[in-house]
């Protein structure tokens, strides 16, 4: 039961890593994880939240190894964009099976597969209650899906970018390696930069900072965490331009 009867946000951009879709597998998409995520998104829609989604592609394609072997970076990034489209198709299908209206929009034209991205159409769809999945990153090489999430969040005038990860917030050090690592509840953009805390790549992070777009990092693998974040309960780490109390 939530102690706060009203959601803390009205329109959000949810960023999911491709790796989150793998579950316990080492590659690809775990159907159980996909369906659970679709159900959690459905809960938000039923609360009246307008939901945009950006999914990474690391579960299907990682370009680093091929780049070291000599592959052109632009080619590798284009392959990565297509991986995000595949994940987007899977998420759209899972949402449809959960009886949630969803639209997949791609930053690169893929006629017959998904719609071309336009920000005016995306906002119109969100206002009508549809979940909008943004695929193919920004459509440009050398840009991460974190950058795409911040860019789309700013464009659709989301109130927050929710970054779903494998850990339940931002820590002073890697909690997997350092048991003494301390979790932060709130941080300012300046503190993250000063302490060199790993939240997302610098280009994405500074874009969010420059447009006063709050970032909330939480554990997407923790059942109910997404709903708690939306209801304004203590969950994850919020990063904003405001100084912590």
Swiss-Prot record:
Chain sites annotated for binding ATP: 15-18, 58, 62, 165, 171, 174
GO cellular component: cytosol
Keyword match Disulfide bond: no
UniProt key word Cytoplasm: yes
EC assignment: 2.7.4.22
GO biological process assignments: 'de novo' CTP biosynthetic process; UDP biosynthetic process
Keyword tags: Allosteric enzyme, ATP-binding, Cytoplasm, Kinase, Nucleotide-binding, Pyrimidine biosynthesis, Transferase
Group of enzyme by EC: transferase
Highest taxon listed in the record's lineage: Bacteria
Homology family: Belongs to the UMP kinase family.
Protein name: Uridylate kinase
Species for this entry: Shewanella frigidimarina (strain NCIMB 400)
